[in-house]
Every structure is written in structure tokens, then in C-alpha cells.
Amino acid sequence: MTLKRAFDVAGSCAGLLVFAPVMAVVIPAVLIDDGRPILFRQRRLGRYRRPFSILKIRTMRDGSPTRVGRILRATGLDEIPQFINILSGEMSAVGPRPLTESDVARLGWTGPDFDSRWDVKPGLTGLAQIVAPASPQEALELDRTYAVRWNPWLDCRLIALSFAVNVFGKARVQRAVASWRD
């Protein structure tokens, strides 16, 4: 087991335990607001473009967000089930955003020029998710940068920044990150 995988297993177990009380509130809220199903599965592309089913809490009905869904999406709580994807080895805690096949086709991210982006597992959080790039091309460059420069310290920093985004807000954290670049 690699260091990254050990970190992912420990982190996803901890995440599932920490968020269990939250899920005890979220699941009944989704049921009351809009009924079943609770979980939403969607086919995404993982490492080496292998498809997998990503898990999320369902937040939409007929293309519109539900009342509870708006809150879950705004807080990122709809992504808690992805700890199961991490535990099963389909995702990592940190990595590029998992994309759908239609996203990849729409963005034109196919062919050997884009292979480095797919050399790592997709993540619950990542460099592009935190930086919030201005364009898909910039997002791709951030994904490639992560894939090439990965190290345990980078993952730790990105996880810390993800927590900061959730506590302080994305705009404040992005200003702080931008000041580090200067």
C-alpha cells in the first residue's frame, strides 16, 4: 500500500466517522424534502480514463435544485458519500475533479496531449477546485501540475486549504493563495 493510499484510507474512514452525525440529519432532510432516492450515482472518468460511479447526495429533481439540495450544494455536504469512493479506491482525497465523458468531449480533453491529467486518481478536492481557474485551459494546466508535482506535502496543503475554503469562504482563501504567488 502506498503512502497516498494509506492516507486516503485513513482519511476516508475518519471523514465517514466525523460526518456520520451530519448524515444523520441530512438523510432525513432529503427524505422529507423530496423523498427517495437519497444517493445519486453518475458515471465519471477516473485514473487512466477508467469509468466509475461517483456517489453524491441527490440535490436535484427534474433539473432544478431542491430546497435542501441548495444548502447541501452550497456547503459541499452533497459530496460526503465520495468518502466511500475514496475508500473503495476509485478516488483519492486530493486529485483532479472527476469529469463525465461528455465533459471531456465538450472540453476536447482527449488524446495523448492530455494523458498526464489522467495519471492520478480524481479527488474530492484538488488544486483546480481551490484555485477556481478562469478557464477550462487553466483548470487543465492546474490538473497537469498536480499530476506531475504530486507529493504528500502538497496533498496536506491542499486539504488544509479546502478546510479553509469551507470555514472562511472561497474568495478570502483565493486572495490569500494569490498573494502567495506574488
Positions of PLM-derived features:
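Intrinsically disordered, low-complexity boundary segments flanking structured domains
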Residues: 24-28, 41-43, 80, 112-117, ...
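An acidic site on a long C-lobe helix of protein kinase domains
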Residues: 2-5, 64, 76-79, 152-155
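A short, structured surface patch at a secondary-structure boundary
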Residues: 63-121, 159, 166
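Conserved catalytic core of Hanks-type protein kinase domains
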Residues: 31-32, 74, 86, 133
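Short, glycine-rich, amphipathic interfacial segments at transmembrane boundaries or analogous
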Residues: 37-74, 124-142
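A hydrophobic, helix-centered structural microdomain
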Residues: 1-61, 157-182
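Juxtamembrane helix-loop transition sites at the ends of transmembrane segments
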Residues: 29, 42, 97, 106, ...
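Cytosol-/stroma-facing membrane-proximal "stalk/adaptor" domains immediately downstream
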Residues: 117, 122, 127-181
